[in-house]
Amino acid sequence: METVAHHRYAKSSSQKVRLVADLIRGCDASRAMEILNFSNKKAARLIKKILKSAISNAEHNEGENIENLKIKTIYVNPGPSIKRIMPRAKGRSDRILKRTSHITIVLSGKK
């Protein structure tokens, strides 16, 4: 049985979120929560929130226990970029891209 949780339009670039996602890929759910608790990155807070949601989905919908859950896949795709303008000298301007990402976690029961 697989359980999925998504976070779309997360306000962090996919490159930064992938650094944290690579740390917990393939881990048990409880071990992944420990790793995320001790990480001081913003992306760790985002992924921890999604992982909690996926664990709750598995417990409520499938009746699984947290000790039996493992992260089957976790992937981060880039979302749309929000364009902003930064004023510069002599009336010029630069474009700033506020990048977003879509995060997906799939949990499966260990057998």
Swiss-Prot record:
<dbReference type="InterPro" id="IPR018260">
    <property type="entry name" value="Ribosomal_uL22_CS"/>
</dbReference>
<dbReference type="InterPro" id="IPR005727">
    <property type="entry name" value="Ribosomal_uL22_bac/chlpt-type"/>
</dbReference>
<keyword id="KW-0689">Ribosomal protein</keyword>
<keyword id="KW-0694">RNA-binding</keyword>
<comment type="similarity">
    <text>Belongs to the universal ribosomal protein uL22 family.</text>
</comment>
<dbReference type="GO" id="GO:0022625">
    <property type="term" value="C:cytosolic large ribosomal subunit"/>
</dbReference>
<dbReference type="GO" id="GO:0003735">
    <property type="term" value="F:structural constituent of ribosome"/>
</dbReference>
<dbReference type="InterPro" id="IPR001063">
    <property type="entry name" value="Ribosomal_uL22"/>
</dbReference>
<dbReference type="Pfam" id="PF00237">
    <property type="entry name" value="Ribosomal_L22"/>
</dbReference>
<dbReference type="InterPro" id="IPR036394">
    <property type="entry name" value="Ribosomal_uL22_sf"/>
</dbReference>
<dbReference type="GO" id="GO:0006412">
    <property type="term" value="P:translation"/>
</dbReference>
<dbReference type="InterPro" id="IPR047867">
    <property type="entry name" value="Ribosomal_uL22_bac/org-type"/>
</dbReference>
<keyword id="KW-0687">Ribonucleoprotein</keyword>
<comment type="function">
    <text>This protein binds specifically to 23S rRNA; its binding is stimulated by other ribosomal proteins, e.g. L4, L17, and L20. It is important during the early stages of 50S assembly. It makes multiple contacts with different domains of the 23S rRNA in the assembled 50S subunit and ribosome.</text>
</comment>
<dbReference type="GO" id="GO:0019843">
    <property type="term" value="F:rRNA binding"/>
</dbReference>
<protein>
    <recommendedName>
        <fullName>Large ribosomal subunit protein uL22</fullName>
    </recommendedName>
</protein>
<keyword id="KW-0699">rRNA-binding</keyword>
<comment type="subunit">
    <text>Part of the 50S ribosomal subunit.</text>
</comment>
<comment type="function">
    <text>The globular domain of the protein is located near the polypeptide exit tunnel on the outside of the subunit, while an extended beta-hairpin is found that lines the wall of the exit tunnel in the center of the 70S ribosome.</text>
</comment>
